């Protein structure tokens, strides 16, 4: 097996190198409005520090946004009051950026003019690293084949469709780690440190909301699970796990709440407008777009895999993990399928969080079963 695992690792490395080679040729000026607004948020952080949470258009006195719009031939680039991705807040008398601050903050960690490439390289390296971790958990040829197919696919997904929005790169990194910890929470042998794991997962999911506001729904399955589990069991451990998840989730979304308070006047007011705040409705065009997209394939795989794990009730904690994933899938699918806008990446976060969780939930108990079997067969020493 060690030679097969080494070969699998080499395959992952080849895909990683291909990613890095492709990413190295990217440009930050590709004519996408969202890109410019995320870069503006990063510029505000680099210029004002944490005060960069205030995205009032009046702070473009250095003409950073205007120059970016000019570079993409935006028709009214000199009039920043017409800037895309900005919303007028009548009560605050401010024109502010609509996005949460997390993506801009992460981009601000890299030098201006060279922010997107290192961010996506980092995202690819994180996926590569956890794919290698999955190799260590593979205990049979079949499980290694699963890891090989999964790892190659997710490393590639770090550039396509992830490159469609800068918010996706940090979101994908969070989904990888949260999926791994979720599997450890429910199916790891002994399930030790459940309180700590619940808190870490809550913090990660909360932090993801700062990258994309829709990532709020990634928490749905966890909240539903902890709530229903407490109603059924009424035990202290379940209550503490749910509370720790909820508290750290709130800590994680604190930057977005603070940004809303500064830009919209209240932590619970939104800076979004237009179609993004439209009432839910079923649109046949949106549904057809999802059915014809790679997102549909990933969601079907996640759904079928969840159903198979639900049937594996003999495996410790597998039903619980499947319930969390199922709850997440249902809530997120309802939201995005009734949202009037389609993009090629909207459901990628829930698909990736679900698939990473299911992968490790499949590998961890199987490796432990093999280990227990080998231990049982060892000769007893006199």
What are these regions (language model features)?
Residues 47-102, 107-110:
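Interfacial juxtamembrane loops and adjacent helix segments
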Residues 138-139, 178-197, 208, 362:
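Membrane-interface transmembrane helices that cradle and orient dolichyl/undecaprenyl
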Residues 195-212, 223, 249-251:
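Membrane-interface alpha helices of multi-pass inner-membrane proteins
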Residues 160-171, 214, 343-344:
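Short acidic/glycine- and proline-prone juxtamembrane loop motifs at membrane-interface regions
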Residues 21, 215-221, 228, 232, ...:
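Membrane-lumen/periplasm interface segments of specific transmembrane helices
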């Amino acid at each position: 097996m060690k030679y097969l695992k080494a070969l699998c690792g080499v395959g992952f490395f080849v895909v990683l190198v291909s990613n890095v080679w492709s990413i190295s040729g990217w440009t930050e000026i590709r004519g996408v409005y969202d890109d410019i607004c995320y870069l503006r948020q990063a510029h505000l952080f680099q210029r004002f520090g944490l005060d960069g949470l205030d995205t009032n258009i009046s702070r473009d006195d250095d003409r950073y946004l205007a120059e970016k719009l000019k570079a993409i031939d935006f028709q009214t680039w000199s009039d920043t009051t017409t800037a895309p991705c900005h919303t007028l807040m009548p009560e605050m008398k401010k024109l502010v950026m609509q996005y949460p601050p997390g993506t801009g903050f992460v981009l601000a960690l890299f030098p201006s003019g060279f922010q997107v490439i290192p961010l996506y390289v980092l995202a690819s390296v994180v996926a590569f690293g956890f794919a290698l971790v999955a190799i260590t958990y593979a205990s049979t040829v079949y499980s290694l084949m699963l890891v090989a197919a999964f790892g190659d696919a997710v490393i590639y997904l770090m550039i396509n469709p992830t490159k469609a929005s800068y918010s996706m790169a940090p979101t994908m990194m969070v989904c990888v780690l949260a999926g791994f910890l979720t599997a450890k929470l429910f199916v790891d042998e002994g399930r030790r440190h459940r309180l700590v794991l619940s808190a870490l997962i809550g913090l990660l999911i909360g932090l993801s909301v700062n990258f994309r506001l829709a990532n709020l729904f990634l928490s749905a399955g966890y909240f539903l699970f902890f709530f229903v589990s407490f109603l059924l069991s009424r035990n202290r451990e379940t209550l503490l796990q749910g509370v720790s998840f909820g508290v750290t989730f709130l800590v994680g979304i604190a930057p977005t709440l603070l940004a809303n308070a500064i830009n919209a006047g209240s932590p619970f007011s939104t800076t979004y407008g237009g179609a993004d705040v439209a009432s839910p409705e079923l649109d046949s065009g949106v549904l057809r777009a999802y059915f014809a997209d790679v997102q549909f394939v990933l969601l079907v795989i996640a759904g079928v895999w969840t159903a198979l794990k639900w049937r594996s009730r003999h495996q410790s904690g597998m039903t619980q993990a499947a319930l969390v994933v199922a709850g997440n899938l249902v809530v997120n699918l309802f939201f995005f399928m009734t949202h009037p806008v389609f993009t090629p990446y909207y459901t990628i976060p829930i698909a990736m969080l679900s698939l990473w969780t299911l992968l490790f939930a499949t590998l961890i108990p199987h490796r432990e079963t093999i280990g227990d079997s080998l231990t049982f067969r060892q000769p007893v020493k006199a």
